[in-house]
Amino acid sequence: VDLTPLPSSKLSRREREEYVLRFYAYLYNYQSFVKSVQKFLKESIELIENDFTGNEARLREILFSTFNFVNRNFKSGFKRNNTVSIVSRVRYEAISVGCALAIQQNPLIADKTNVNTNWAFEDEFLSMIRSDASNSKPKVIARIEYVRDKILEAT
């Protein structure tokens, strides 16, 4: 909850649950993303539900290990800085899924601390996630894999 602060108006619309859905949808299916986020999420729900049955512990561990890693290594969590009160969806998706992919590729990363994540506050990454960043398939893939590769390089 601390990593994804949301105003009460968004909480009442169940946006926290949507962030969890976005995490799993992009983690397992980001390369299939086309253009419409809502359509992508809707199509991903069925895939996630099928995978969730019998795998609850593993899926929960992926989420928790990713969030713990972000909490330890990103000075502002998913936020751009500590003065911002909410987390942008695009930033959240890129960082959460990119970190999870890196952890899946190298599970030893999950327990690392003091990983250099300064790149998350530099122009190259910020331009990938700015408010007018497109949700085109190449851009979604590029920002998720950028985070994954930066985490793998830094560990």
Short names for language-model regions:
Residues V1-T155:
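Flexible coil/loop and intrinsically disordered segments
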